Amino acid sequence: MTTLSLVRDGDWQTLLSYLPSEYARLAVEHKQLQTQYGNAKITTAESLLRFILLHAGANLPLLQTVTLIAEAGGPRLSAMRLHMKMRRAAPYLQALVERMTPWRAEARAEQWAGYSMVLIDATTVCGPGATGTDARVHTKLRVADMAIVEAEVTDAHGGETFKRFLFQPGELAIGDRCYCNAGNIAHVVECGADALVRFNGYSLPPLQLAHGGSLDALAASRGLREEGVLDLPVTFEHGDERLRGRFIATRLPRADAEEARKRVRKEHGAQVSPALLESAGFVMLLTTVPRERMTASKCLLAYRLRWQIELQFKRWKSLCGFHRLPNYRDDTIVAWLYAKLLLGVLLDRMSVDRSELSPPVQLEAIPPQARKRRRRRSAAPSEPAVEGHEHPVPDDRGGPAATLSA
């Protein structure tokens, strides 16, 4: 999606066709078109979105954005007025994203042991010159078709929790160790779904074994050999209720375990404990999935799918420029991020419906002589294409597994 695409009328109308049908009504509902004076330049939701998506999608300064649209024959707006519009636009853009994310919810997802697998994670973004996190983008991603089911933008204080999302019966929520606490798991179970998370003994109440006594996760895992799997039924408390689950563990291959210990040493420095270093050599999971529905080995394989959401965040930051926050204001940052999310969902839709955007050439409609000339031209030597550079894009050598420690 180029800068020209967002300015040119033909491309712009194509983009609008992918938006929810009620995008204009939502703009009125969220008071985006209210004005104090009669000479307002932006009077339609279409004009408002054109300014916002050009500003965020092309990473243009405010002044350059309004200048480009004015030169293309659009409304003449001051940079300060666009800034004020951005400050108020976050709720409207959020409503658009919420209506666009479940667009493939009716599709029959590929199921694994009867589950629809959903990945939950968040990525951080920083502003210019920042020394810490300025905002977080929280996402629920369905594995079967890599569709964004839900997304939410918060400031730096918005924690990672399953409670930000609603889950459906038949879903399996997969998250890393920061989601491993009793409240998060209880929320998923209350929705009628199941959870599969990386075990974090520091954030959980003591796990009780079926025969009595508390589980010592490291001691129980210590006797495992490579490729061995431990599967123990456990219970734990959340308020007045007791939840049932399974503790699953396996030992990492020696090379992967050493890499995991290097990461732990780098993160904790001299304060790293021997127990933490030893536990880095294992993958430990906690799940509410019944044993008769999914074996421990299958749960370990399912957790390895979590790396897909990390790749999605990298794609967003690469293609949509998520890592380039425009300024320091919380309100405009949230609006800017929702605009980026909206563009990401639009790209997702367009990639699925690409045949409608670029219909294939019907060879039967081309005269035979023209077909011969076309073949001769394609056989002639020509300048290398843009993609034909000296350094080919490297393969993803991490492979689909990316190790169990991912």
Language-model segment annotations:
Residues 64-71:
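Short alpha-helical "recognition helix" segments of helix-turn-helix
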Residues 83-105:
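Short, basic alpha-helical nucleic acid-contact segments in DNA-binding proteins
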Residues 72, 88-92, 322:
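A short structural micro-motif
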Residues 1-59, 67, 76-77, 81, ...:
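Single, function-defining residue in the core of a domain
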